[in-house]
């Protein structure tokens, strides 16, 4: 999911957790005697294909950057699997997006000593066309304004520009909390606070971003990767650019307070699942112990420990994108980026060699994968599984959102075996370009008004590998009673309040904010019953969300089996429900901007550029 949208989504979930009506009812006698429900449960838990499917998708095919060759190969594979199971499926093109092929990345320090550096290209970066580029690395200065920046640009010609701050320690916050003296921690606090202030987006007198200054006074944005600043530097003739977005610093992860640690105030220590904060870190790293679950009111603003940077995961970097077409853009791990930065800072003239294999492929077809099991009694009413199929490609796209994809695929396989003649049509949507702004799902809703009209329920999952522990929705008067009745179909495995597998449901009459930053939010524009599936964390935001460590080994297969089985059971219950969910909105004062994800979907890269 996208960073800003993810922040909005988790803010809503946090508020729902406080305000919503939550119940955990004992399983009904009907659940224990329903032969189809029991068959679904046994197939899902005893003969899961999740490990086999996951290994093929994550290891063999790999990450699914929108419109890349791997994205197309993955779409062909999913379609093939569905057809082998007797499920109708197709790749449904809705537009184009810029295509890109990732090859090898070799990044080396050549002077003042030789060292291979740990890093890779940003997505959509140009390569070096078979001719390695060696150039001096220089730090992007801080400018008074964009005029001063333009005057400086000739000095950057032929150089590799360092675009990020050098984080003063690459150790995790836990080390500092456990081993550091009070004096040492205080000094590190001050150093980090100064770094954040020095590299933060520049603001005007009202505290809003100053459009004439923005990042380092350049007047350009760094965005998720190199942004418009990268294209301006490219125009000036730089040889390349290097950034580093580690998970240690509030600065490098300014919106992660939604999942970061601590209770806020002066920082939050190691932090559990923090609140809805989003400012650059300015506080202390001495917050006490694991942070409690938070809301917008107590969100962490800490510097190192519990602030917006989260729990301080190390050994990971976030890998996003570049809009360059000539100058390559790479990202380095914290340790190696800091090495190059210190050499440049101390005027020791680091020379870096980039040898990068990549192909910019121009606009390529992009698509959603749509599958269905046709309904026998009400074929024009639909129950839908939803998960985005695309990913960033620094890792394997395993937990974001390969596990959501696997949940949906495995649930469809189970349903075809245990419930082959559903009352309503069962659909699955594997969306493209979620990471670029929910583009694939938005296009589907625009192209399929008949599905929007007949949608009984949509179940969306996009929050990592953990087992689903909550089902939640809001806005429509009729959703609550239906969720309650569907809950009654679940075997005791999911309803025993003493079990770690227990699943609760919640309903909030009036939405408390924007419906969030994943594809389920798009369906709220059409007042459809969109149900979110909330999962346990497994340090998702800290270690695998958008990082180089989002790989097969991070998947918790038992939790994935749990999720696929639960999804299949809920789809079965929604399909069998004798009544259709009303579109009547709940009374009350709704947020003025709700929902905020509506609009015309981009059908090509051009609007983004």
Locate the predicted segments by residue.
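Active-site-adjacent substrate-binding region
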Residues: 211-217, 221-222, 230, 234, ...
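Disordered, low-complexity segments in secreted/periplasmic proteins that are enriched in proline
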Residues: 208, 216, 248-315, 603-609
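Soluble metallo-hydrolase cores and metallopeptidase-like ectodomains found primarily
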Residues: 34-36, 125-150, 288-398, 410-413, ...
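Metal-dependent peptidase/peptidase-like ectodomains
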Residues: 113-116, 130-135, 144, 154-158, ...
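Noncatalytic luminal/extracellular "stalk/propeptide" segments of secretory-pathway proteins
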Residues: 33, 42, 55, 59-206
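Short helix-loop-beta-strand segments that form the rim/entrance of peptidase-like active sites
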Residues: 52, 414-439, 458
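N-terminal hydrophobic or amphipathic helices/low-complexity stretches enriched
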Residues: 29-71, 80, 373-377, 584, ...
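Bacterial N-terminal signal peptides
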Residues: 10-24
């Amino acid at each position: 999911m996208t960073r800003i949208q993810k922040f909005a989504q988790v803010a809503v979930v946090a508020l729902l957790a406080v305000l919503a009506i939550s119940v955990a009812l004992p399983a009904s006698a009907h659940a224990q005697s329903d032969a189809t429900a029991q068959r679904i449960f046994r197939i899902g838990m005893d003969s899961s294909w999740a490990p086999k499917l996951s290994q093929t998708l994550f290891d063999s095919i790999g990450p699914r950057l929108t419109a890349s060759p791997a994205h197309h190969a993955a779409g062909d594979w999913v379609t093939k699997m569905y057809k082998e199971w007797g499920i109708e499926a197709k790749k449904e093109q809705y537009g184009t997006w810029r295509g890109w092929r990732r090859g090898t990345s070799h990044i080396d320090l050549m002077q003042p000593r030789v060292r291979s550096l740990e890093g890779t290209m940003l997505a959509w970066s140009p390569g070096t066309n078979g001719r390695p580029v060696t150039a001096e690395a220089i730090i992007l200065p801080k400018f008074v304004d964009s005029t001063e920046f333009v005057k400086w640009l000739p000095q950057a010609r032929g150089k590799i520009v360092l675009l990020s701050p050098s984080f003063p320690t690459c150790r995790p916050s836990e080390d500092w909390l456990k081993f550091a003296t009070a004096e040492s921690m205080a000094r590190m606090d001050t150093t980090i606070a100064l770094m954040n202030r020095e590299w933060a987006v520049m603001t005007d007198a009202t505290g809003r971003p100053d459009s004439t200054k923005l990042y380092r006074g350049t007047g350009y944005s760094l965005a998720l990767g190199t942004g418009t600043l990268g294209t301006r530097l490219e125009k000036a003739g730089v040889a390349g650019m290097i950034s580093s977005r580690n998970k240690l610093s509030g600065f490098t992860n300014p919106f992660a307070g939604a999942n970061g640690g601590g209770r806020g105030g002066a920082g939050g220590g190691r932090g559990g699942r923090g609140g809805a904060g989003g400012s650059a870190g300015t506080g202390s790293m001495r917050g006490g112990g694991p942070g409690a679950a938070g809301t917008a009111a107590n969100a962490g603003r800490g510097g190192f420990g519990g602030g917006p940077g989260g729990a301080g995961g190390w050994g990971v970097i976030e890998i996003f994108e570049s809009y360059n077409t000539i100058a390559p853009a790479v990202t380095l791990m914290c340790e190696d980026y800091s090495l190059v930065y210190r050499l440049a800072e101390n005027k020791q003239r680091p020379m870096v060699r980039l040898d990068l294999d990549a192909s910019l492929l121009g606009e390529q077809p992009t698509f959603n994968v749509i599958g269905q099991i046709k309904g026998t009694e009400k074929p024009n009413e639909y129950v839908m599984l939803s998960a985005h199929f695309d990913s960033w490609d620094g890792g394997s796209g395993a937990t974001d959102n390969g596990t959501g994809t696997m949940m949906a695929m495995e649930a469809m396989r189970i349903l075809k075996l245990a419930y082959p003649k559903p009352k309503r049509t069962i659909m699955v949507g594997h969306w493209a370009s979620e990471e670029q702004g929910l583009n694939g799902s938005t296009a589907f809703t625009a192209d399929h008004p008949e599905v929007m009209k007949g949608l009984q329920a949509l179940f969306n999952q996009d929050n990592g590998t953990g087992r689903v522990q909550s089902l939640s929705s809001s806005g429509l008067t009729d959703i609550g009673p239906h969720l309650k009745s569907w809950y009654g179909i679940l075997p005791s495995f999911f309803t025993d309040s003493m079990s770690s597998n227990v699943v609760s449901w919640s309903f909030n009459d009036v939405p408390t904010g924007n419906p969030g930053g994943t594809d389920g939010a798009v369906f709220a524009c059409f007042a459809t019953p969109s149900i979110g599936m909330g999962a346990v964390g497994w340090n998702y935001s800290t270690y695998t969300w958008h990082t180089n460590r989002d790989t097969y080994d991070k998947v918790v297969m038992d939790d994935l089996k749990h999720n696929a089985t639960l999804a299949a059971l809920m789809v079965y219950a929604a399909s069998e429900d004798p009544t259709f969910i009303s579109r009547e909105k709940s009374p009350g004062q709704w947020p003025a901007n709700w929902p905020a994800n509506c609009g015309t979907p981009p059908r090509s890269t051009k609007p983004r550029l």
